[in-house]
Every structure is written in C-alpha cells, then in structure tokens.
C-alpha cells in the first residue's frame, strides 16, 4: 500500500535534489571500481549544501547500496542528513528490499506519493529482485494511474530507477525498463505530466518527448561514458541534479559536479 504526504514548499516554486546510484557498502572505505563511494557521496552532499540552501525534497533514485546491507542504507541516511530536507528513496537493481525496508522503519523514506507546492511527485519501484533490467508491475502502474487521477490541478513528476528510452549505449540499453510502452500508454492522456526522472545510467540525460521532459542524473560515485558500445567509465566527477518546479508547470534543472576533489577510479575495469 502506498503512503502519501503533503510537504510544504519553501516558496512559489519547489526545489528538488536528485542523488542517484550511490552504491554504498557496509564497510568503511569500501570501493567500487576504485572509488570510495561513501567519500564521494559525502563530497557531493557537501556541494549540495553549499549550492542549495533550501531544499523541499531529496530523491535517492535507486542503487543506494552496492552490497544490499542494512548498514549501507543507514550510512546513506547519515551521510545525507546534513541537508536537513525530506528524503524519499526507492530500489534499484543493486538494492535489497528487506534491508532497505528495515532501514526505513519509523520514517517516510519509501513513501510513493508526495505533494509539494503545486506538484505531485510519484515514486515507482521498477526493480526486479535478482535481475538487472527493470519492469513496472501492474501494482506500480495502478498506483501511478490512481495518483494521476487524484492529483487535481497539480503538475506531476514521476520517478523510478531504470531508463524507459534508449540512451545510445549498446551495453546499457538492454538493461533498462522492459515495459516502457505500458508506461507511455498510461501517461499519454494526461497533459499535466511534465517530467520522468530516473537513475541507473550514471550520466546526464536530458530529452523531450512531447510535453514530457526526460531526465537522468550523474551518479554520486563513478560515471558511465555516454554513447559507449561496451562498459566504459567516464572521467567526469560525481555529481547531482537539481530541479526547480514552478507553480505554473515550468521546470528548470541542471547538473553540478564536485570540482575540488580528485577521486581515485580504476578506469581499466571492464565491468562490475
């Protein structure tokens, strides 16, 4: 069953921050492809705190954990706490639902519908336990339909982990959302739908599909090279996406990356 809350906006617009694909571990100093993922998240959070003094909602868009441990999820909560803003998260293909739920107890972290300002944010679980690609099950599509139908005059942003459109990377496109047409068919009659936001691809993505803005964010750790045929790491730094959602339905967004730290990365790795 989905939960639903109203989060007061700070002014006539809404400021969201997307933190994606942090790939945290239980152990201090653990590394993914040579990068200390807790250290990189900490530096991204420090940058967010400097650049975004008032945040209405933080979205952690999947792959919060690399090892699926309870400690990795509590680590994320601890490292993101300095931002002092409402946080919601959902699972990616590397996450484990049971520890993620345990880390959520006593909070609204897994809440799937959040009304903030003149917008409704709907968060869906596209993960398939034990698999890399994604799929939106009927219960998630039904939740989305109900959320849209009950949104009134609000504009909508919908977020999940897996990419619903090709991104031009031969190795990544087969591991995106397996049933994107079901999603787009559901969304087609609703002009108040303004944005789809996802993670998974570890790179910036910004396209338009009719009235829909299609957006993805860099990872807070390692980056994947756009347009690559095989697994390839990019040399861009970790970062985050900010989104300003205006009451009239306009959306402004941008990417910011850590530019004052040199991170150690194993660029010769052929996968993970």
Swiss-Prot record:
The taxonomic lineage of its organism, from the top, reads: Bacteria, Pseudomonadati, Pseudomonadota, Gammaproteobacteria, Pseudomonadales
Residues annotated for AMP binding in this entry: 23, 63, 93-94, 202
The UniProt activity regulation field reads: Activated by iron. Other divalent metal ions have no effect.
Q: Which organism is it from?
A: Pseudomonas aeruginosa
Q: What is its EC number?
A: 3.1.4.53
According to the UniProt entry, its GO molecular function terms are: 3',5'-cyclic-AMP phosphodiesterase activity; metal ion binding; nucleotide binding
Expression triggers: Positively regulated by Vfr in response to elevated intracellular cAMP.
Subunit relationships: Monomer.
- State the protein's name: 3',5'-cyclic adenosine monophosphate phosphodiesterase CpdA
Q: Which gene encodes it?
A: cpdA
Cofactor(s) this protein cannot do without: a divalent metal cation
As its record notes, the protein acts as a catalyst of: 3',5'-cyclic AMP + H2O = AMP + H(+)
The domain of life for this entry's organism is: Bacteria
Instruction: Show the InterPro entries listed in the entry.
Output: Calcineurin-like_PHP_ApaH, CNP_phosphodiesterase-III, GpdQ/CpdA-like, Metallo-depent_PP-like
Which pairs of Cys residues are joined through disulfide bonds in the record?
none
